[in-house]
C-alpha cells in the first residue's frame, strides 16, 4: 500500500505573539555594501548603536558608510531642534563622504517620540543638494528582513520615469566603445539573443555574483533584465514606466511590490521565489509564461542540480524540521526542504502576506502532495511559549530558530540552526542550493561526528531536559 496523503488545504493561525526576530535596522549591514554610493544614517538610541556595532562586526575607525545619529535627552524632551541637528549631521556627511544619497533609518525611538522624518527630509534635501530617502525600520512594526523592504519601497518611489537625454547619449557612447573593433554581425547577434518582450525589473538585494547568475539564467531563455532594484549605485536606479513588468526575488518584499504596483503602475509577476532548484525553475518558468516564451532546458538543469545534491539529501531524507520564524524566508525554505525528503509539522512566520506569497504557498501545497507528506501548519506571529511546548511534543530532528532560542534548545537536546545565517548566505538560484543544504545539515553532521568520537554526553540522547 502506498502512503498517499489525501489532498487538504493549508491551515493558517495567528497567535499574536511578540516579534521574536532580529532587529530590522540590521538591513543596513548588507544594503550599505550593495549600494556603493550611499550613506545610511540610523536615527536611534545607544541600544541601536550597540546592536549595529555587534551585529555587523565593523570597527568604527574602518569608516564604514553608515553612522548612528544618537538621540539624547534633549531630543526626547524637545529641547533640541530636530531639523538643525539633522542638518548639522548631513552637512558633515556631505563634507566627509559626499554620497549620492543619504538614507535615514527610523527606529523604535523615532516612532515613539513621533519624529516627522518624512516631513523634514524634503526641506533638508533641497537645502543640502543630496537626495534623502526615509525608511522606517523599527522593531515595533517590522520583522527582521522587512527593514530592507521599507528601504526598497522608498527607493522604488525615487526611480526615474524616463531616461534623460544626457544619460542616453552617455550609454550609447559606452556601447559604441565596447563594440569597437567587433564585427557588426557579432553585435547584431548579441542583440538578437533576446526575445522582444516588455521591460522587466527585478527587485531584491542580492550579492553581485547571484545577480549575475539570475540575469544569465533569464538570458538563456531570451529574457533581458532591464534593471535591478537596488542598483549598485543610487545614480543607476532603473527607469520604471507605467506597464513595466516587475518580479521579486525575496518573499519579504511585499511593501516594495505594492509600491511598484500602486504608485508606479507596474505589473507584478506572481512567481515562487528562486530558492532551491525547484523554486528557481518555477520562477523562470513563470516569467517565461508571462512573456509567452517556451522555456528551454530547465527540466534537465533542475535534474542535474538534484543529482549533485544527493550526498546532502541522504543526511536529511525522512527527518523533520520545525521553523520558529524570524526572517520571512520560512515558506520558501520549508518547500525546498520538503522536496529534499524532510517533513515539516509547523512553519512559524512573523508576518504573512498571502497575496504576495500566493504562488509560493501553492507550490508548497503541490510539493507536499507530490512527496506524500502532510501539509505544515502555518502560524503567523507565533507565541514562543506555546511553540516551545509544541517542540517538546513533536521532538523534531532540527529547529530553525532565531539566535535567542538556539542555546536554550540545544541545552535541552534539540538540534538547532540559526535562521539569520540563511539571510546572509547566498541561497538564490540553481547553483546556490548546495549552500542551503550545507547550513541545514551542519548540526546533524556535527552530532554524527561527536557520536563517532564516542562523546555521547554531548549528543542529544544524553541531554537532560
Curated annotation (Swiss-Prot):
Biological processes per GO annotation: light-independent chlorophyll biosynthetic process; photosynthesis, dark reaction
The entry's keywords: 4Fe-4S, ATP-binding, Chlorophyll biosynthesis, Iron, Iron-sulfur, Metal-binding, Nucleotide-binding, Oxidoreductase, Photosynthesis
Binding-site residues, [4Fe-4S] cluster: 23, 48, 108
Reaction it catalyzes: chlorophyllide a + oxidized 2[4Fe-4S]-[ferredoxin] + 2 ADP + 2 phosphate = protochlorophyllide a + reduced 2[4Fe-4S]-[ferredoxin] + 2 ATP + 2 H2O
Cofactor binding, note field: Binds 1 [4Fe-4S] cluster per heterodimer. The cluster is bound at the heterodimer interface by residues from both subunits.
Transmembrane segments: none
InterPro entries in UniProt: LIPOR_BchN/ChlN, Nase/OxRdtase_comp1, Protochl_reductN
The keyword Metal-binding is assigned to this record: yes
Enzyme class: oxidoreductase
EC number: 1.3.7.7
GO molecular-function term, one example from the UniProt record: oxidoreductase activity, acting on iron-sulfur proteins as donors
Pfam families cross-referenced by the UniProt entry: Oxidored_nitro
Necessary cofactors: [4Fe-4S] cluster
Pathway field: Porphyrin-containing compound metabolism; chlorophyll biosynthesis (light-independent)
Keyword Protein transport tagged: no
Family per record: Belongs to the BchN/ChlN family.
Task performed by this protein: Component of the dark-operative protochlorophyllide reductase (DPOR) that uses Mg-ATP and reduced ferredoxin to reduce ring D of protochlorophyllide (Pchlide) to form chlorophyllide a (Chlide). This reaction is light-independent. The NB-protein (ChlN-ChlB) is the catalytic component of the complex.
Stored HAMAP family: ChlN_BchN (MF_00352)
Subunit record text: Protochlorophyllide reductase is composed of three subunits; ChlL, ChlN and ChlB. Forms a heterotetramer of two ChlB and two ChlN subunits.
Protein's name in the database: Light-independent protochlorophyllide reductase subunit N
The species this protein was found in: Trichodesmium erythraeum (strain IMS101)
Protein's gene: chlN
Amino acid at each position: 500500500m502506498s502512503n498517499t496523503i489525501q489532498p487538504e488545504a493549508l491551515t493558517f493561525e495567528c497567535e499574536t505573539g511578540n516579534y521574536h526576530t532580529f532587529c530590522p535596522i540590521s538591513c543596513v549591514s548588507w544594503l550599505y555594501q550593495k549600494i556603493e554610493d550611499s550613506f545610511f544614517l540610523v536615527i536611534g538610541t545607544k541600544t541601536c548603536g550597540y546592536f549595529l556595532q555587534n551585529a555587523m562586526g565593523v570597527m568604527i575607525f574602518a569608516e564604514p558608510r553608515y553612522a548612528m545619529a544618537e538621540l539624547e535627552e534633549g531630543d526626547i524632551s524637545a529641547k533640541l531642534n530636530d531639523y538643525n541637528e539633522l542638518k548639522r549631521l548631513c552637512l558633515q556627511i556631505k563634507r566627509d563622504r559626499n554620497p549620492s544619497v543619504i538614507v535615514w533609518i527610523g527606529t523604535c525611538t523615532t516612532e515613539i517620540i513621533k519624529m516627522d522624518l518624512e516631513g523634514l527630509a524634503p526641506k533638508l534635501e533641497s537645502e543640502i543638494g543630496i537626495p534623502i530617502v526615509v525608511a522606517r525600520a523599527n522593531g515595533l512594526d517590522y520583522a527582521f528582513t522587512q527593514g530592507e523592504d521599507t528601504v526598497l519601497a522608498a527607493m522604488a518611489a525615487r526611480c526615474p520615469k524616463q531616461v534623460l537625454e544626457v544619460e542616453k547619449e552617455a550609454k550609447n557612447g559606452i556601447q559604441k566603445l565596447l563594440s569597437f573593433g567587433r564585427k557588426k554581425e557579432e553585435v547584431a547577434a548579441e542583440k538578437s539573443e533576446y526575445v522582444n518582450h516588455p521591460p522587466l525589473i527585478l527587485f531584491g538585494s542580492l550579492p553581485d555574483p547571484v545577480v549575475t547568475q539570475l540575469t544569465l539564467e533569464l538570458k538563456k531563455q531570451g529574457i533581458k533584465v532591464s534593471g535591478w532594484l537596488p542598483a549598485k549605485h543610487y545614480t543607476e536606479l532603473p527607469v520604471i514606466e507605467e506597464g513595466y513588468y516587475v518580479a521579486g526575488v525575496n518573499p519579504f518584499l511585499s511593501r516594495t511590490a505594492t509600491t511598484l504596483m500602486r504608485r508606479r503602475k507596474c505589473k507584478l509577476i506572481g512567481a515562487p521565489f528562486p530558492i532551491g532548484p525547484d523554486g528557481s525553475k518555477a520562477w523562470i518558468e513563470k516569467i517565461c509564461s508571462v512573456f509567452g516564451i517556451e522555456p528551454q532546458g530547465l527540466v534537465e538543469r533542475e535534474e542535474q542540480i538534484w543529482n549533485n545534491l544527493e550526498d546532502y539529501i541522504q543526511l536529511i531524507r525522512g527527518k523533520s524540521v520545525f521553523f520558529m520564524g524570524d526572517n520571512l524566508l520560512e515558506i520558501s525554505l520549508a518547500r525546498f526542504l520538503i522536496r529534499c525528503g524532510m517533513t515539516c509539522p509547523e512553519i512559524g512566520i512573523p508576518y504573512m502576506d498571502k497575496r504576495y506569497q500566493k504562488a509560493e504557498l501553492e507550490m508548497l501545497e503541490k510539493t507536499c502532495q507530490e512527496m506524500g507528506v502532510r501539509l505544515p501548519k502555518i502560524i503567523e506571529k507565533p507565541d514562543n511559549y506555546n511553540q516551545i511546548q509544541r517542540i517538546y511534543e513533536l521532538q523534531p530532528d532540527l529547529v530553525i530558530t532565531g539566535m535567542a532560542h538556539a542555546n536554550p534548545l540545544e541545552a535541552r537536546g534539540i538540534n538547532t540552526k540559526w535562521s539569520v545565517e540563511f539571510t546572509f548566505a547566498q541561497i538564490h538560484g540553481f547553483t546556490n542550493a548546495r549552500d542551503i543544504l550545507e547550513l541545514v545539515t551542519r548540526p546533524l553532521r556535527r552530532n554524527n561526528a561527536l557520536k563517532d568520537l564516542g562523546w555521547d554526553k554531548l549528543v542529544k540522547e544524553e541531554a537532560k531536559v
